[in-house]
Amino acid sequence: MTALRVVSWNVRSLRDDSAGVAAALRALTPDVALLQEAPRLAFSGLANWRLARRAGLRRIVGGAPAAGNLLLVSPRVQVVDAHAVRLPKRPRLHRRGAVLAVLEVDGRRFGVLGTHLDLDPAARLDTAQRLRAALPAVPPLLVGADLNDETGSPAWQALSAGLVDLGQDLGPTFPQRSPRRRIDALLADPAFTVERVERPDPGPVTDHLPLVADLHLPPVAQTSPGPGAPVR
């Protein structure tokens, strides 16, 4: 089976310690990194490119076009299809979005979604439902998200339906200095074989703890020409 290491992490716009985030990502050696709150303002493309380079990864899609979500991959990962999603802005709330991609490692394809849900409960649920409807039509699927909500909530249930909650036994992920809430998730298709899941603490380089999963892709992956339906 083909091994795959995945990281999901909220990096708080690299405001705390951009070099520390890059060093932590390099040390974690992910094949796929799904980042939330990546730089999204003026010149953010350059900041995200620098982050990827310093971490030894490739910037694929995201940043401002995906409302702060960012997809980075290692050199061994091939990109079949990738695009950014920007959802309509709601009054008094931040714009939300996602990165969606179909990736390939050793000839085996899989779909990924990275997103950051709203602070408002109703908006959170609506965003989760919209994104689930647009998941790449390529099993197996991986989702990395900051849900701004905890297990059992309607939004968490909507986003995780049919997937395995890889971090369910790891404890809270926020805030980094004294974690009290588990609002970050790595979700995986049951077809993946899970070797190990961790919640390392890289120090105060951002306000969330990362989630890291070592997985194995199934021997045979179903393929499809690209992602699912557009998000509206």
Regions found by a protein language model. Give the residues of each.
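N-terminal, active-site-proximal structural segment of metallo-dependent hydrolase catalytic domains
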Residues: 1-50, 129, 217-232
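Active-site metal-binding loops of divalent metal-dependent hydrolases
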Residues: 11, 38, 115-117, 145-147, ...
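Active-site neighborhood of phospho(di)ester-bond hydrolases with catalytic His/Asp-centered motifs
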Residues: 33-36, 60-62, 142-146, 165-169
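Active-site environment of divalent metal-dependent phosphoester hydrolases
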Residues: 14-16, 39-44, 120-123, 147-154, ...
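Structured beta-strand-rich core segments of catalytic domains in phosphoester-bond hydrolases
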Residues: 32, 37-109, 198-202
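His/acidic metal-ligating clusters that form di-metal
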Residues: 100-105, 111, 125-147, 151-156
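Active-site-proximal beta-strand elements of phosphoester/diester hydrolases
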Residues: 3-13, 81-83, 100, 109-118
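Metal-dependent phosphoester-hydrolase catalytic domains
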Residues: 77-84, 89-90, 136-141, 148-232
